Regions:
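A generic "binding-loop/recognition-motif" signal
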Residues: 106, 125, 141-142, 162
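A short hydrophobic beta-strand segment most commonly corresponding to one strand
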Residues: 86-89, 110-112, 136-137, 151-170
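Conserved short histidine dyad/triad with adjacent acidic residue
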Residues: 73-77, 89-104
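A short, N-terminal "cap"/entry segment at the start of jelly-roll beta-barrel domains
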Residues: 2-85, 172-204
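Short acidic-glycine-tyrosine-enriched beta hairpin
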Residues: 124-140
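Glycine- and acidic-residue-biased ligand/ion/polar-headgroup-sensing regions
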Residues: 96, 107-118, 123
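Short histidine-centered beta-strand/loop micro-motifs
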Residues: 78-79, 99-105, 128, 146-148
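Short beta-strand His + acidic residue motifs that chelate non-heme Fe in jelly-roll/DSBH
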Residues: 100-102, 120-121, 137, 143-150, ...
């Protein structure tokens, strides 16, 4: 991996009219909050009251995809939401023939493949996957994700420990190749699927 760069977490709060459901503080869109501030004395009792008042179910229909046009992200749980401080949960959707950015970082990640067929390239080695598989990105691995189908999308649910690593000041991350700014050839029509399809049960 190339010499890593330090990424300093931003401390800016969402501005007026911005909501967690409609926008995410990732990539080049906005300042990012990876870890909420911890400062001064606090009451564990008050913190428990606050946590218990948080929603136990987040409506996926209210959380929109961003990025694209080949790789889209929908961030379900982030530290800035106030629900969790140690992990990051998001959905990735790859258009037909699409690919993600190529980068590397200190934290590991697990990709549960929900739909489609594709492959990873980790440190120059290809690993194929299909729906039902789990792809593991290990620490300090330069990686990129690819949809192997030219006609169908693919999607994966991703769990990361990135916020915990940021909290421990293990901030090293390096982008090697940015997300494509143009659709994959032949997939100019594709938009991320906002709805969830049930692939496991027959319709009544």
């Amino acid at each position: 991996m190339d010499t890593p760069e330090s990424v300093t977490p931003a401390v800016a709060e969402p501005g007026p009219g911005e909501t967690v459901a409609n926008e995410s503080h990732y990539h080049s869109k906005k300042d990012r909050i990876f870890v909420r501030a911890i400062q001064g004395a606090y009451s564990l009792k008050d913190e428990l009251v606050r946590l218990r008042a948080m929603p136990r179910v987040r409506k996926g229909s209210e959380i929109k995809f961003n990025d694209g046009p080949q790789a889209y992200s929908r961030h379900y749980v982030e530290p800035k939401d106030g629900i969790t401080q140690t992990f990051h949960l998001h959905l990735e959707e790859y258009g037909p023939g699409g690919k993600s950015q190529k980068h590397g970082h200190v934290n590991e990640a697990a990709f549960y493949i929900l739909d489609g067929e594709g492959y990873e390239v980790h440190d120059g080695i290809r690993y194929d996957w299909k729906a039902g598989d789990i792809a593991i990105v290990h620490n300090n691995c330069v990686h990129q994700h690819f949809n192997a189908s030219a006609t169908r999308p693919a999607r994966a649910l991703v769990i990361k420990t990135k916020p915990m690593y940021m909290f421990m000041n293990m901030l090293f991350q390096k982008q090697v190749e940015p997300r494509p700014s143009e659709p994959a050839p032949g997939a100019e029509w594709f938009k991320a699927r906002e709805g969830e399809d049930d692939f496991n049960h027959e319709s009544d």
